[in-house]
Design a protein with these regions (language model features):
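Vicinal oxygen chelate
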Residues: 1-17, 23-33, 72-168, ...
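Core segments of cupin and vicinal oxygen chelate
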Residues: 19-22, 26-65
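A short linear-motif detector with a strong N-terminal bias
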Residues: 4-9, 35-38, 48, 58-62, ...
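A signal for specific C-terminal beta-sheet/loop modules enriched in small/flexible residues
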Residues: 70-83, 136-146
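Short acidic, gly/pro-rich beta-turn/loop elements at beta-sheet edges
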Residues: 39, 68, 90-92, 135
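N-terminal start-of-chain detector that recognizes signal peptides
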Residues: 1-3, 20, 28-31, 50-56, ...
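Conserved short beta-strand elements that form part of the metal-binding/catalytic scaffold
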Residues: 46-78, 122-129
Length: 169
């Protein structure tokens, strides 16, 4: 019988990993109605990079790549995309998993290797992606602070007509 500490312990890191992932790029979802999913994520402040009836790419204001990828299909979580900083890592992964390096979606650019985790979820590893153009960041709201002098002395009006922008995944 294992103790709670043993059951909840994080597995040790591999001493010789196949590659070093440098970041989370995107989550991948499928939804029967891509347009409805796009509107849902826009309501939370994401921005559309590209969208049609079969595929939508959305991002936050600071994201350099699309951070939410929605494909048409039964409602499901499909997997995620991760990035590596070295093209050799893609080829090493492809060889180790008996797959190929392929061109990534044109809106993202670069190359990718698509793997499956033990539960069958897609894990896409990308390299050489093209950064998206920066989006204007929201201006910060000036607030009166107890020790702040001089006082701002003006009314702050918040814009509730649209959701706040999502900064980053």
């Amino acid at each position: 019988n294992h103790s709670l500490a043993q059951r909840c312990a994080v597995p040790a890191r591999s001493n010789q990993p196949l590659c070093k992932v440098s970041g989370l790029v995107a989550i991948r979802l499928s939804r029967p109605e891509v347009g409805a999913a796009v509107q849902f994520f826009k309501d939370f402040g994401l921005t559309v990079v590209s969208a049609d009836q079969d595929l939508a790419l959305l991002r936050g204001t600071s994201d350099l790549t699309p951070s939410v990828i929605v494909e048409r299909g039964p409602a499901a979580y499909l997997g995620l995309s991760l990035m590596v900083d070295n093209a050799k890592d893609l080829h090493h992964l492809a060889a180790a998993h008996h797959t190929v390096v392929q061109a990534n979606h044109p809106a993202i650019g670069g190359q990718c290797v698509v793997l499956r985790d033990p539960d069958g979820l897609q894990v896409q590893i990308i390299h050489g992606w093209q950064p998206l153009a920066p989006l204007p960041a929201a201006t910060s709201i000036e607030l009166n602070q107890p020790q702040h002098t001089p006082r701002i002395n003006r009314t702050v009006r918040l814009d509730y007509s649209r959701p706040p922008a999502i900064n980053k995944l």
